[in-house]
C-alpha cells in the first residue's frame, strides 16, 4: 500500500510540473498489479506451481487451490487451462496422497467444465474422464469421492460425446449404479439428479440413459432410494421427478402398484413436489 501511495504521489507531482513522466521500467510490478490487476494466466501458473512444490505447506497449497478454482470460474480462464498446459498437472493432483488436495482438484475440475463445452472437450482430450472414474473407484474418503462424482457429472451434462464415451471406460456405468445402490443421501442424490438432467436433454444422451435404465433397473433403484429417505423432502423430490420422466418414456419400476401407493403417501407429506396436474399425470401413467 505504501508503494502504491508513493507511486500515486509521484504521478501527481509529475502532472503539476513540466518534467517527463517516470520511466515505466522503473515501476514496481507489484504496484502495477495493484492498479491493473494481476494477469490471470500468471496467477494460474503460480497457483499450480505452489500446489506442486513440496516445500510449500499444505495450508498454503489449499489456498493456492482455492485461488485456482476461483480463477477458472471465469470461462476464459477455464479455457486457458489448455494453452497453459495445466490440464495434465491438474488431473495429476487426483493422485495426491493428501485427501484435501484430491478433493480440491476434483472441485476445480468440476468448476472448469461446468456448462463449458470447450473445457469439457479439453478434459476428454486429456483422458480426463477415464482418470476421474479411476479416482472414483480408488477414493476412500466420502467427502472427496463426492467431489470426484461432482466433477464427473459436471463433465457429462450437456455433453453427448462424453456420455457416448462411457461405454469405452471400463465399469463406468457400473460405478454410477453402485453409488445409486449405496443409498447415500448426498452421493446417490447427485447420481439421481444427473440421470434426471440426461432425461430432459433431447439428444442421444437421453436415449443412452433410457437404454441403461432397462439394463440396470435404474427406476427400481431410484424408487428404493426414495423409500429409504422418505422423510427427506429433497431426496424424495429428486427421486420422484426422475421416476416421472422414466415413466413418461415407458421405463418403470417392476411393481407399479407399490409405487402408486407410495405416491399417495408422498403426496400427503410433500404436496408441493408436483403441481396438481403433474400428480394426476403421474398417477394416470402408472395405472
UniProtKB/Swiss-Prot annotation:
InterPro entries: ARM-like, ARM-type_fold, Hsp70_NEF-Inhibitors, Nucleotide_exch_fac_Fes1
Gene Ontology molecular function: adenyl-nucleotide exchange factor activity
One Gene Ontology term from the biological process aspect of the record: cytoplasm protein quality control by the ubiquitin-proteasome system
Keyword annotations of the record: Cytoplasm, Nucleus, Phosphoprotein, Repeat, Translation regulation
Biased composition (Polar residues): 7-20
Residues modified to Phosphoserine: 18, 20
UniProt-annotated stretches for the region Disordered: 1-30
PANTHER family: HSP70-BINDING PROTEIN 1, PROTEIN FOLDING REGULATOR
Known role: Functions as a nucleotide exchange factor (NEF) for Hsp70 chaperones which accelerates the release of ADP. Required for fully efficient Hsp70-mediated folding of proteins.
Family: Belongs to the FES1 family.
Protein name as annotated: Hsp70 nucleotide exchange factor fes1
Species, as recorded: Schizosaccharomyces pombe (strain 972 / ATCC 24843) (Fission yeast)
Gene that encodes it: fes1
